[in-house]
Amino acid sequence: MMKKKSWFTLMITGVISLFFSVSAFAGNVFWEPLSYFNSSTWQKADGYSNGQMFNCTWRANNVNFTNDGKLKLSLTSPANNKFDCGEYRSTNNYGYGLYEVSMKPAKNTGIVSSFFTYTGPSHGTQWDEIDIEFLGKDTTKVQFNYYTNGVGGHEKIINLGFDASTSFHTYAFDWQPGYIKWYVDGVLKHTATTNIPSTPGKIMMNLWNGTGVDSWLGSYNGANPLYAEYDWVKYTSN
């Protein structure tokens, strides 16, 4: 009886220890498979447009989940020369740390598929942003960029050596007080060290078509529906 009691006590102690280890780890890591709408963690943008170069209206109906467990953002047209697009963003703000995503961008001229952090005047802060963007006109490349108090101009185009629109790959940036490092499938591709942003922001993913920025995105030809897919997101704090 004593042997059974000792074994049971040991087992319970082990389970409790494992629970607290996982809890402590979870305090530093946010990881989520994007297989369903978790309203406690995420929001769907709905019913408004960013204006300026964004030629679409964010719609909750353009944020969906596939049967095989992927987030699917869509660009659609409800009427002639009217477009709806999809954006998914975290409810919480996140600061310095490693941000990772497994995604497959849409391919078409005049569009952008993205993964980024953002905060700005609408959130009561300065405009700070860190970007991973795919310009649909050439998905064999990825663009990295960032803004600090609204100052950007740090675009860096990287040749991937593959077409990102055909399969899922992992893209990441490590944001620290003195630098930002961007990675593709775990390989360092670019480092920035000047005027690094500091304000925590929301984790965001979106798909949209542009207007008035043909020199950057190419001219959007009205093709729809178009889709960008996301498998999972992970954030590891300092």
Swiss-Prot record:
**What is a single molecular function from GO for this protein?**
licheninase activity
Keywords linked to the UniProt accession = Disulfide bond, Glycosidase, Hydrolase, Signal
Catalyses which reaction?
A: Hydrolysis of (1->4)-beta-D-glucosidic linkages in beta-D-glucans containing (1->3)- and (1->4)-bonds
Q: Where is the active site?
A: E129, E133
Q: What is its EC number?
A: 3.2.1.73
Quick one: signal sequence residues? 1-26
Q: GO biological process: any one?
A: carbohydrate metabolic process
Family annotation (SUPFAM superfamilies): Concanavalin A-like lectins/glucanases
Disulfide linkage: C56-C85
Which InterPro entries does the record associate with it? Answer: Beta-glucanase/XTH, Beta_glucanase, ConA-like_dom_sf, GH16, GH16_AS
Q: Which residue ranges does the record assign to the GH16 domain?
A: 29-238
Hydrolase as a keyword of this entry, yes or no, is yes
**Remarks, miscellaneous:** Beta-glucanases of Bacillus have a substrate range similar to lichenase of germinating barley.
NCBIfam families reported for this sequence = BGlucanaseBglS (NF047856)
Per the record, the similarity remark reads: Belongs to the glycosyl hydrolase 16 family.
Tell me what this protein is called.
Beta-glucanase
Specify the species. Answer: Paenibacillus polymyxa (Bacillus polymyxa)
